[in-house]
């Protein structure tokens, strides 16, 4: 991602990054809950 493409909409990029962030948070929450409840 060195040169930003003017054809790409920033809204879609923000949605993709937000979706990936939510997935990471869910995985981390599952790992922490498994640690705490064992």
From Swiss-Prot:
Topology term for the membrane: Single-pass membrane protein
UniProtKB keywords: Membrane, Photosynthesis, Photosystem II, Reaction center, Thylakoid, Transmembrane, Transmembrane helix
Keyword Thylakoid found: yes
Subcellular localization: Cellular thylakoid membrane
Intrachain S-S bonds: none
Pfam family, one: PsbL
GO cellular component, one term: photosystem II reaction center
GO biological process: photosynthesis
Major localization class: membrane
NCBIfam families xrefs: PRK00753.1
Quaternary organization: PSII is composed of 1 copy each of membrane proteins PsbA, PsbB, PsbC, PsbD, PsbE, PsbF, PsbH, PsbI, PsbJ, PsbK, PsbL, PsbM, PsbT, PsbX, PsbY, PsbZ, Psb30/Ycf12, peripheral proteins PsbO, CyanoQ (PsbQ), PsbU, PsbV and a large number of cofactors. It forms dimeric complexes.
Role: One of the components of the core complex of photosystem II (PSII). PSII is a light-driven water:plastoquinone oxidoreductase that uses light energy to abstract electrons from H(2)O, generating O(2) and a proton gradient subsequently used for ATP formation. It consists of a core antenna complex that captures photons, and an electron transfer chain that converts photonic excitation into a charge separation. This subunit is found at the monomer-monomer interface and is required for correct PSII assembly and/or dimerization.
Family the entry assigns: Belongs to the PsbL family.
Name this polypeptide is given: Photosystem II reaction center protein L
Chain's gene name: psbL
